[in-house]
Amino acid sequence: MCKKLNGVFAFAIWNDKKQELFLARDHFGIKPLYYTRLNDELVFASEVKAILKHPNCKAVINKEGIEELFGIGPSHTPGISPFKGIKELEPANFIIYSKDKFIKKEYWALKTKNHTDSLEKTCENIRFLLEDSINRQLISDVPLRLFIIWRFRFKYYCNICE
């Protein structure tokens, strides 16, 4: 299911019939999703501080996570958090959780291949992908605004948005 989703997401779906929870994170990990297992419970949230509010969750420092936080700043190894027992669901992964089951699996991986297209074909493909991406982001129920930092790209983006 997640392979077919296009965009940024982190979500949970409860299947009442199977008594299962399905958690998933987008392909590149843009949206965060943290979790911890506390006895029979799976506690999850988009921020660690929300998990720490759970009465059974203790804020115990994870040395590896703290070293990364101070060593490389906001960048970090996928899956690592500054607190013991609290993990970040890696990009392009999902979890299926029930009382007697915990499955964590990668649903997608970036693949590389040799580039054989001509410059013209490459430019055509990039234009299509860029326009498709922008057009999907323009779907909104509120007025849209465009904020572009790079001046030389501004006119191009505005033309696509029209």
Task: For each feature predicted by the language model, list its residue ranges.
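Cysteine-centered catalytic environments shared across enzyme families
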Residues: 1-162
